[in-house]
Structures are given as structure tokens and as C-alpha cells.
A protein has these predicted regions:
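Conserved PLP-enzyme active-site core in the AAT-like
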Residues: 1-184
């Protein structure tokens, strides 16, 4: 994965996508945190409540436009930062490609990452179907890097089972220091 992303990364293997997403979010979240995602996000709809139960973070599910989250939606949620009565928006989770089959462009991902980082939030990409997004965006390593590491994504779950493997996913922390807690 270091070679694929063109830099040193911290990588951990998991059995399935739910485990990968839970591991990634747990490494980034603290008690009282919230994860911003779309209302159709896999972590919100299909993972049997594992992200909230295991991670202990509230999911804030926002209306998707063609399956996508917009930077303005992140900015709208930033009002809760520092308010003692609200879960603290700390992580933005996007899915690439989305549950609707749409693909975020590299520029869209970069805009989301920029908005999240401006508000002190980290960005998680559920990449169960990342190979499809890369294929739709040119099919090159450069396309993968443009929509992940170059755009500012902090952690990606890299799909194996939806891309032909019998079992297994990878959690890739694009900043190895962010992934230091992943091993625990």
C-alpha cells in the first residue's frame, strides 16, 4: 500500500467491511464524537448499528444528493463544535463509489476534505468499491491518489471482498500517525 499511495501509510487487515469501517472510525473517534455521513451511507444503513455501538460515536446522517455529501452540509454541522449539549462533529465519512453508484470526483473529495479539516474534522472514506471509482476516473494509480491521498483523505477502508477476494479488507491510514491507534 505504501507504493500504491506513494508514501508511507499504516495498514491493517480485517475480515470484512464492517470491521474495517469500525476499526478506522474507532482509531479517529473519542467519546462524545459524531460522524457526519449521508443518510444512505453503508455505515448508517447496512452495518447493523456497529459504528454507533462499537465506536461509541453518534452518526449524523444528512440527506444525500445522488448519494453524495456536499461541503456546505459539513459547514452547517460545525455549529455544534464546542456546544456541550451536542455530540461533537469530528469525522466526515464518505463512500467511494457511493451507494447509488455515483462517483465523487477528485475535486469533490478535496473540497469535502478541505471543509472538514478547516473545522478540525478528519475524513474517512469507505472504499469498499474504490476500484469501481478508480475505473470510472481513468483506471490509473494517479486517479486513485488524486481522490484519496492528494485530496486529503485521512483514512480509507480498501475493499477486497467486493473486488474479487474471498475475504478481507484493509484499513489504510494515509498519515501513519493517525493510524497508530489502529493496532490496538
Amino acid at each position: 500500500f505504501d507504493e500504491l499511495f506513494g508514501r508511507a501509510v499504516a495498514t491493517y487487515l480485517t475480515f470484512n467491511g464492517t470491521g474495517a469501517n469500525v476499526m478506522a472510525l474507532t482509531a479517529l473517534a473519542r467519546p462524545g464524537d459524531a460522524v457526519i455521513c449521508t443518510d444512505c451511507a453503508h455505515i448508517n444503513v447496512d452495518e447493523t448499528g456497529a459504528p454507533e455501538r462499537v465506536v461509541g460515536a453518534k452518526l449524523i446522517d444528512l440527506a444525500a444528493n445522488d448519494g453524495k455529501l456536499a461541503p456546505e452540509q459539513i459547514a452547517d454541522q460545525a455549529h455544534a463544535i464546542g456546544v456541550a449539549h451536542h455530540a461533537q462533529p469530528a469525522i466526515v465519512s464518505i463512500t467511494q463509489s457511493t451507494e447509488w453508484g455515483t462517483v465523487y470526483s477528485a475535486d469533490e473529495v478535496a473540497a469535502i476534505c478541505d471543509m472538514a479539516h478547516r473545522h478540525g474534522m478528519r475524513v474517512h472514506m469507505d472504499g469498499a468499491r474504490i476500484a469501481n471509482a478508480v475505473a470510472a476516473s481513468g483506471g490509473t494509480v494517479a486517479a486513485l491518489r488524486a481522490m484519496t491521498v492528494d485530496a486529503g483523505v485521512d483514512v480509507i477502508t480498501f475493499g477486497g471482498t467486493k473486488n474479487g477476494l474471498l475475504g478481507g479488507e484493509a484499513v489504510v491510514f494515509l498519515d501513519p500517525m493517525s493510524g497508530a491507534r489502529g493496532q490496538f
